[in-house]
């Protein structure tokens, strides 16, 4: 018997809402693929994807960042939020992989190499530097942040609220409190 076919229109809608909330309400991985929409520069040295164990791969936006302020160089940065172990795939888009270091080395993250990509698992939030072929300046800065537990709105008391997007110092409100 097809239970969905038996349900009335209103009940079908309620069932769909319940399924959606049960699926997204327990999300343990939050990605931010919308980087291109913010006007931030993209760095295509690497392609990064993450997934909950055995789940579907999700794209992560690779930001172009500046490092070494004495001799400015471009590097890559990605960020996502995790609340449970995740699998990470980092594909090197230019050249071959001879050597990989995932810093801090003391953490001892083990990785596997498959052609021009590495795979590893993160069991908790961490900030890492992934270096290919001894290149410390054109590395990938990976920020696996903890899931957000606090939420704020524009009307929250004693909070200077900045909504989603890119903000610069000129965006600060001029308050004389």
Model-derived segments and spans:
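Generic detector of low-complexity/intrinsically disordered segments
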Residues: 9, 16-17, 142-144
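Bacterial N-terminal signal peptides that target proteins for export
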Residues: 1-14
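Hydrophobic h-region of N-terminal signal peptides that target proteins for export
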Residues: 17-26
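Alpha-helical protein-protein interaction elements
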Residues: 13-16, 154
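Extracellular/periplasmic carbohydrate-active domains that bind, remodel
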Residues: 28-177
């Amino acid at each position: 018997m097809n239970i969905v076919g038996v349900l009335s229109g209103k009940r079908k809608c309620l069932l769909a809402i319940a399924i959606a909330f049960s699926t997204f309400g327990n999300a343990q991985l939050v990605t931010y693929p919308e980087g291109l929409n913010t006007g931030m520069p993209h760095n295509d040295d690497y392609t990064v994807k993450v997934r909950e164990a055995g789940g579907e791969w999700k794209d992560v936006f690779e930001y172009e960042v500046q490092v070494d302020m004495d001799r400015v160089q471009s590097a890559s940065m990605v960020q996502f939020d995790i609340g449970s172990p995740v699998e990470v795939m980092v594909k090197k888009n230019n050249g071959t992989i001879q050597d990989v270091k995932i810093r801090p080395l003391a953490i001892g993250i083990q990785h596997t190499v498959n052609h021009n990509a590495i795979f590893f698992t993160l069991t908790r939030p961490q900030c890492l530097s992934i270096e290919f072929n001894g290149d410390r300046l054109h590395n990938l800065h990976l920020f696996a942040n903890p899931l957000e537990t606090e939420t704020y709105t524009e009307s929250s008391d004693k909070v200077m609220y900045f909504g989603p997007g890119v903000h610069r110092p000129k965006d600060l409100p001029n308050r004389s409190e």
